[in-house]
């Protein structure tokens, strides 16, 4: 197969950001897309098969655009742009970077980083209730938190309510030491951490004291009507159907709700059906409700986490297929008329 060359102009001041320390990112692009990248000052030459060169050029142009906008290029940016180049979406990736949800107390912009995350953020803007379902590391809770804080700062809502079911990893609150607050705090700690990072401790504590930010176990929602609030239910896979119904019927006028969960991390007793699973079936046709499914492609943590998530997804898919085959065989044996050779 004949090789082609493509020449890209990337100013020297952007090269270290784009190609990574010790050319780490350049090597990833070369290995994955099967191209050769040669850098001479601001001239970047890409050599390889025509389709591969087009993909690599699209990836490099995208990373250059990110760098021009002041972004620190990460391995996640590189891996995701490579993956999207195979789907011919690399050119439209820059549109995602244009969407800044809000900024942290340190001034860092919080943005969706994948097409799935962009769809999730847009759904939160447009719909009254949004279910974000997907594996760990896809930004479900963090982006929802950023959207809540942005709505609060813009006076779109009067308060933020964050809640979780207090059932995780097989622990029961009654068996844990301390008073109720000390028992539930570990379950709510990830929510506190995100709020501290985005708002800053001073602003967070001031709004907590005023009752404008509330972080509480799901059981505290019973019997209330929540008006003009941005409400986030995290770890929803650990709700029962009754708890989910109770929560969703608390919603009042002017409120927005985001429900996040990961069905692969359910901590309910073995025979208990998840309220999140039931809700996706019961409410899927309600127009004001959006269901956004995030996948391993939307994982923005360490690349190894993405591989782990993908391995578990493949395993669970194979297990489900095997269970269906067993059920089919069982059904065919039950329906078959016995003959004299059957025991």
For each feature predicted by the language model, list its residue ranges:
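Conserved helicase motor core of SF1/SF2 NTP-dependent helicases
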Residues: 105-117, 122-233, 237-343
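Hydrophobic side chains in well-ordered alpha-helices
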Residues: 18, 25, 55-59, 244-247
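Interdomain "pre-motor" coupling segment immediately N-terminal to P-loop NTPase/helicase cores
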Residues: 38-97
């Amino acid at each position: 197969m004949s090789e082609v060359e493509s020449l890209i102009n990337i100013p020297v001041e952007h090269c270290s950001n784009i190609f990574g320390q010790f050319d780490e990112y350049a090597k990833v692009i070369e290995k994955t897309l099967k191209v050769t990248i040669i850098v001479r000052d601001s001239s970047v030459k890409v050599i390889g098969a025509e389709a591969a060169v087009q993909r690599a050029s699209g990836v490099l142009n995208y990373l250059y655009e990110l760098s021009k906008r002041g972004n620190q290029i990460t391995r996640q940016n590189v891996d995701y742009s490579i993956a999207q180049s195979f789907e011919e979406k690399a050119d439209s990736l820059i549109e995602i970077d244009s969407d800044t949800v809000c900024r942290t107390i340190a001034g860092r912009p919080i943005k969706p980083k994948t097409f799935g995350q962009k769809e999730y953020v847009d759904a939160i803007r447009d719909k009254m209730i949004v279910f974000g379902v997907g594996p760990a590391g896809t930004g479900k809770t963090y982006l929802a938190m950023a959207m809540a804080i942005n709505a609060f700062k813009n006076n779109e809502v009067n308060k933020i309510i964050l809640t979780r079911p207090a059932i995780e990893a097989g622990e029961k609150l009654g068996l844990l030491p301390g008073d109720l607050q000390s028992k539930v705090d570990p379950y709510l700690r990830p929510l506190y951490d995100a709020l501290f990072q985005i708002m800053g401790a001073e602003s967070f504590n001031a709004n907590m004291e005023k009752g404008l930010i509330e972080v509480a176990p799901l059981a505290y929602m019973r019997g209330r009507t929540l008006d003009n609030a941005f409400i986030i239910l995290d770890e929803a896979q650990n709700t029962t159907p009754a708890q989910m119904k109770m929560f969703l019927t608390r919603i009042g006028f002017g409120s927005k709700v985001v429900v996040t969960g990961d069905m692969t991390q359910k901590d309910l007793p073995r025979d208990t059906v998840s309220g999140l699973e039931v809700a996706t079936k019961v409410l899927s046709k309600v127009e004001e409700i959006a269901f956004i499914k995030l996948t391993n492609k939307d994982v923005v943590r360490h690349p190894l986490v993405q591989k782990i998530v993908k391995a578990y997804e493949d395993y669970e898919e194979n297990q489900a297929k095997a269970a269906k085959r067993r059920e089919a065989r069982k059904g065919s044996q039950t329906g078959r008329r016995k003959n004299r050779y059957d025991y």
